[in-house]
């Protein structure tokens, strides 16, 4: 199982088994990461922890453990096993971070499988009559259980409807996801499946007044942010021109090693993100670098797609091929990537959860009906908006991009800190639609940063008329850039050349969107697109209308229609079938018992 997950040269791995308990486990982790020095054991070596991801604690927690006589090792995660000794079954609800793990308690002849309360760090599982298999990447299960190498029809339907699978389902037949905030215990051959956390706990909190919320948020954010700067190596700050990374920069804690800032960008054009992020870094006295797409991104695009699909178990495909490319370059600057991602979802009600309007002609008739029905069926009406964001949208719809990042760097965001999310539930009703508390935090902690506008025209020193004009201009440019790229409706495709001429003449093309897959699929990557679609047509994969595939390729490459989403769907599922079903080696050396692989 381990070999399927050890696909980077900087990964470390190991195995651990307790045959008398029927446990055979292994782990994979990037070197010098939080989990790279496992297994974590207590002094008597009768409690063992295998871990994936990261967990954050205040210094007081470690001090308290030492005062109680525990010998904490040098490894970043060594304190966890001692916290379990002290807390027992209450251990899991004390954890703060994105993680999954397996505790083997030899004293009780008992084991616990658990994940973070949001389910961002996944555990895939499959149960047979005589064993339970689980792994943090689905490919590890497919490696040893070839009978699972088939698509789950409902999972594929959800994927084509929303770009993700929902409510514990996966792309693979017989493989499920551990529910959010779960702890499964194993004892004497029995498995007890429980949850240690429910969002209802946070939903039941009292609502604060606006003034109290603003004050509490400032105090909480400044107190919790230093956790995310703890590292044995330099921190890399993935900096944009948006509000959420600006809040981080406004409240920068003292660090032993000065962080480095960087911004992802396209080949040549300087985006607003790049220009404004550089100004933010300069105000904070930090170095800033631009990480650009290079010619090798296009010349090696097929391998970038395959690498992305493999690392994310098929949840990110051709439209995300840049993620590992950029994060690999970011790793050269720092193995830890701190971002402002998910701040909008948790604090301001931003949502990207909506159906993908794929052309019905792409799909076979039965699948087209199923996808349409699925898109109509799923709704989050009546659900608390933060519960939906933190426990549904982020671990389901937004899973793939952080997963690609985590394959290269330690991915961190303060906006999923337990204290921040819990506090967000107490915001007055109007706060999630307002940015006032965000602006007040920035102004209070680094007034100079509030004078630099965001990419959407917010903040900055200007009178009301100038500020309003800037916001209107920024939002208009952003919308035009979106239309020029993946957002161009097929019915407006005939205006493609006019839109390109307009944005070029106004010198606004690429100011917001440096990822131009729609255009790349017409030009630099046209040969790749046509080759893959013809290959799929030859194999006649059952999902598609084979007669439409060649037509789709021609229509897109010539610029007559925008089929960028359809191309991505076909390319991604083709790569899943090829990499994870047909070409994935089979591993005969496995035990039919409780088996785990972590990475």
Model-assigned labels for residue ranges:
Residues 1-296, 304-305, 571, 577-579, ...:
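Cysteine-centered catalytic environments shared across enzyme families
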Residues 10-12, 18-19, 174-179, 319, ...:
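Adenosyl-5′-phosphate
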Residues 93-95, 243-244, 272, 317-322, ...:
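Short, glycine/acidic-rich beta->alpha junctions
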Residues 218-225, 320-327, 331:
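Short, hydrophobic/amphipathic alpha-helical packing segments
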Residues 230-232, 330-335:
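Glycine-rich phosphate-binding loop signature in dinucleotide/nucleotide-binding domains
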Residues 235-237, 336-339:
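Short glycine-rich phosphate-binding loop at a beta-alpha junction
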Residues 244, 342-343:
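Catalytic metal-binding/acid-base residues of hydrolase active sites
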Residues 266-327, 344-362, 378-381, 408-409, ...:
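ATP-dependent adenylate-handling ligase core
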